[in-house]
Amino acid sequence: MMAAERRIQPGELRHWEPMARYTSWRAGGPAERLYRPAGLADLVAFLRRLPEDEPLFWCGLGSNLLVREGGLRGTVILTQGGLDALRVEGEQVHAEAGVACGRLSRYCIRQGLAGAEFFAGIPGTLGGALAMNAGAFGGETWSRVRRVETVDRHGVLRRRGPEDFRVGYRHVSGPAGEWFVAAVLDLEPGDAQAMQARVKALLSQRNRTQPIGEPSCGSVFRNPPGDHAARLIEAAGLKGLRRGAAQVSERHANFIINTGGATPADIEALIEQVRDEVARRHGVTLVPEVHIVGEAQS
């Protein structure tokens, strides 16, 4: 395999790297610079070398990210595969931001610690889950957070508690110019076999109702208060709606799938069309969960 075709390695910096390789939609323009740190100390050293005005973006599994065809100017920090340390101390789990949520759930179950089972249903990394208070199966990320560790663009690390952040439904705000690099989660003892059985049942139900295995970002829109985005989209008759090779899933209306060769422009146009049509028919303006970044193709 040629070097240009393989995925970036820990400690490696690439220029104009296609982000389609690192997003769950399998679509996206290039990053001017893409860096995957070889651990937290390496990340700190890298950030200290960056120019003061360098734009910074963060990416885990790319499961809630759409990069326009014109790409991203600046540097993208790829945490998955770089910040992936996990350890347990008593009833607390220390996890870095690049740890996939599914891996985190499995690790906690193996350790006999309950409370993290819901992470099995989050298709991203812990860093992304912290940034948006991601949830699944009735659980939310920040309900388990004891403290977090952040880094700023100068490579300064800080420990912070939940009191430093405003946390809501799929929204987190806190100190400006800081990004999550790790967290400590509070859990409690549980029966590993029972937890495994519960997660298996929940994932089986999810697989029956969601287009798992097809390129998507997971849920496209937040649920509005007292309702479900999928219900509103389906009631508007939008299941199966297409724009280019992007399609509203026939299985779950709050998923947009890449049926093969969809461009970021296809996906963004379909998101806008669904949002506008739901607003016209139901008087509800849906708010996207997905982050749309980068420049349109000139």
From Swiss-Prot:
A single Gene Ontology CC term: cytosol
Domain of life from the UniProt record: Bacteria
Annotated compartments: Cytoplasm
Keywords: Cell cycle, Cell division, Cell shape, Cell wall biogenesis/degradation, Cytoplasm, FAD, Flavoprotein, NADP, Oxidoreductase, Peptidoglycan synthesis
Main subcellular location: cytoplasm
Entry EC number(s): 1.3.1.98
One function term, GO molecular function aspect: FAD binding
Every FAD-binding PCMH-type domain range: 26-190
Main EC class the enzyme belongs to: oxidoreductase
GO BP annotation list: cell division; cell wall organization; peptidoglycan biosynthetic process; regulation of cell shape
InterPro entries membership: FAD-bd_PCMH, FAD-bd_PCMH-like_sf, FAD-bd_PCMH_sub1, FAD-bd_PCMH_sub2, MurB, MurB_C, MurB_C_sf, Oxid_FAD_bind_N
Cofactor: FAD
Residue positions of the active site: R170, S219, E289
Listed Pfam families: FAD_binding_4, MurB_C
Listed pathway(s): Cell wall biogenesis; peptidoglycan biosynthesis
Record field: catalytic activity: UDP-N-acetyl-alpha-D-muramate + NADP(+) = UDP-N-acetyl-3-O-(1-carboxyvinyl)-alpha-D-glucosamine + NADPH + H(+)
PANTHER family per UniProt: UDP-N-ACETYLENOLPYRUVOYLGLUCOSAMINE REDUCTASE (PTHR21071:SF4)
Described purpose of this protein according to its UniProt entry: Cell wall formation.
Family that this chain belongs to: Belongs to the MurB family.
Annotated protein name in UniProt: UDP-N-acetylenolpyruvoylglucosamine reductase
Organism, as annotated: Alkalilimnicola ehrlichii (strain ATCC BAA-1101 / DSM 17681 / MLHE-1)
